[in-house]
Design a protein with these regions (language model features):
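Short recognition patches in nucleic-acid-associated and regulatory proteins
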Residues: 2-17, 21-25, 33-78
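Intrinsic disorder/low-complexity signal
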Residues: 9, 29, 104-105
């Protein structure tokens, strides 16, 4: 068993509330943007410039974002994969990041 230290940010401090995000996602889809590709996972608004967009890994059943690229899927909780985020939400991530330790059961 090996412990992994990663930098994460709390989903609730980075994302908008569910209803606001869902409303923004619907508006973005009406404009032709795609969820998971060109819509921000945190706020649901369109990502205008995909070349400068960041991707964050959503882990622990959706409660944390991280930039860590290792074996997240072996930690406790569920791995929800990589999602694109816009520049404003990425700044919120960096502002709220903290280090946590996860247990890798391999």
């Amino acid at each position: 068993m090996k412990n992994i230290k990663i930098v994460v940010a709390d989903w609730n401090k980075v994302s908008l509330g569910y209803e606001t995000r869902e409303r923004n996602e619907n508006r973005s889809q009406e404009k032709g943007f795609e969820i998971g590709y060109s819509i921000c996972a945190c706020c649901g608004k369109p990502i205008e410039n995909l070349e400068t967009a960041k991707s964050l890994h959503l882990i622990e059943g959706g409660s944390y974002f991280t930039e860590y690229e290792g074996e997240i899927n072996t930690c406790t909780g569920s791995d929800m994969g990589w999602w694109r985020v816009g520049p404003t939400c990425y700044k919120k991530f960096k502002k709220n990041e903290k280090e946590i330790e996860l247990v890798n059961e391999d």
